[in-house]
Amino acid sequence: MAQVDSQDRWGEASPLSSLTEEAHDTQMLSMNLESDDEDGGEAEKEGTADPVACPRGSSPVTHENPDLPWPHPLGKEEEKFSDSSSAGGMGQKPVEMSGKASWSRDVTKINETQGSPGASRALGSLPSGLAHKLLGQMQPLGDRLPAGDDGYSGANQDAVLDVPPSFPSNGKYLCAHKSVDTSAGNSSLLCFPRPGSNWDLPTQETHTPAQASATPASLAAAVLAKARNSRKVQNQAGRREGGEAEARPYRCLRGGRAFQKPSKPLSPAETRGGAAKRYACELCGKAYSHRGTLQQHRRLHTGERPYQCSFCDKAYTWSSDHRKHIRTHTGEKPYPCPDCGKAFVRSSDLRKHQRNMHSNNKPFPCSECGLTFNKPLSLLRHQRTHLGAKPFRCPACDREFAVASRMVEHQRVHSGERPFPCPTCGKCFTKSSNLSEHQTLHTGQRPFKCADCGVAFAQPSRLVRHQRIHTGERPFPCTQCGQAFARSSTLKRHQQIHSGEKGFLCAECGRAFRIASELAQHIRMHNGERPYQCEDCGQAFTRSNHLQRHRAKHGTCKKEPIPSSSDE
């Protein structure tokens, strides 16, 4: 509300000034009321009338009090209007109190005044608009206002109830003096509501000296600002509480923080270094202690691979995997085995090598044959040989496998893929184990020796199979005829005799073979490949057994074990 000078408020914008023009019409009303009760009027002028018996029940009001906070611009005609309106409309009587006069409502007097014949005749001679206003002023202060000309009858429930009635006008009320105390600095005003206004009536208050020193505009501005701020704070608090309750309905019982999704309580295992895992994934609910770790975890859901290899087209999610992959191009192997000196690209590969090759700790024995293994997965694979379970089927030839990796290696036979090349001679292999065995031909390194005969082998699996010759162990029996074999590959060949299965077809001539090694040897006849060459004369052969027979002809040739691609 803008600050307005008190003189301007009483001059142009005051609602009392709009009624000044109608004050001449109200003289007839006051004369009629005085003629109906002439005796009461004379007693009132002489000051001897009983205050209780006075039909108007009001003392004369003086507008020339110098203690008022603003000058009154109205003349004697307004005084007449004030006397008549207060006498006919208020129906109140003064009560003797110490120092000042107080007022009490008398609804019976108001009803009697409204129903008097003189008042009815006087109101009937007035215009309808003015009579409507006077009747609105004669209602008790506690009643709700009637509907205005615009038909709006609902009272504004958000009206400011603590607006002091001491300032003259705010566009909704008409103010008139109630009484003037004999003591200096004490005065009070009565606010008459305008008919048709949608404001609730304010409570009557006594005008204090502190209020008298302030201007009406400043008082109204302060009150409205206070109410506006209080409603604003309440609305913001309600929206904040309601929005938070709707968006974050789950609250921690210990810390008081609110969350969008429920989660189980944190256990000691879910904290690292005493720090709670506060950053939870929105998709799977997994929590982390640091925001950066959560951002890296989100790549698993989005499929983002920001680490691109500069040598090939492969990309990786984690920087550690990217560094390990780079070592395959550079040939770096920073993890050597302390027992045999073999180096590895990954530390996990070194641990696996030490566990499989150099460790004698094999706590997982097979209940069927007693063979021990160093990890439960190896035991599970071995037990499938006894049970005959082969859950992995090749989609090309319907061949079944007990291990998924064996099926992947088998599918390379159909596709012709050989992803493991020899860095020395360039020969490619379908299995990494076959490449390792082939590389021993170039290096001559055979670190695994038999304790019985002293024969050395490049792979520990070769040593294990060789030791079965001395022990006579045959751990792979046939489920149909009961015949046992020392090697699993030999058992597979034998089982194909019973089934008659030949799942390996030659793409050139259509000939079928039972095992992949036979198909590989057959394909060499079509492409002319001769990978087995005699070191003495340089003659090459398609099969390793042909090379062995050729060496037998040379007296100086030594018979060396040739690795077979079909053996495990």
Swiss-Prot record:
Keywords: DNA-binding, Metal-binding, Nucleus, Repeat, Transcription, Transcription regulation, Zinc, Zinc-finger. GO terms for cellular component: nucleus. Residues 1-106, 548-568 are annotated as: Disordered. Disulfide bonds: none annotated. It comes from the Eukaryota. A zinc finger (C2H2-type) spans 279-301, 307-329, 335-358, 364-386, 392-414, 420-442, 448-470, 476-498, 504-526, 532-554. The keyword Disulfide bond does not apply. InterPro entries: Znf_C2H2_sf, Znf_C2H2_type. Residues 1-11 have a biased composition (Basic and acidic residues). Its main location: nucleus. One of its GO terms (molecular function) is DNA-binding transcription factor activity, RNA polymerase II-specific. Signal peptide: none annotated. GO terms for biological process: regulation of DNA-templated transcription. It is found in: Nucleus. May be involved in transcriptional regulation. PANTHER family: TRANSCRIPTIONAL REPRESSOR PROTEIN YY (PTHR14003), ZINC FINGER PROTEIN 143 (PTHR14003:SF23). Belongs to the krueppel C2H2-type zinc-finger protein family. This is Zinc finger protein 648. It comes from Homo sapiens.
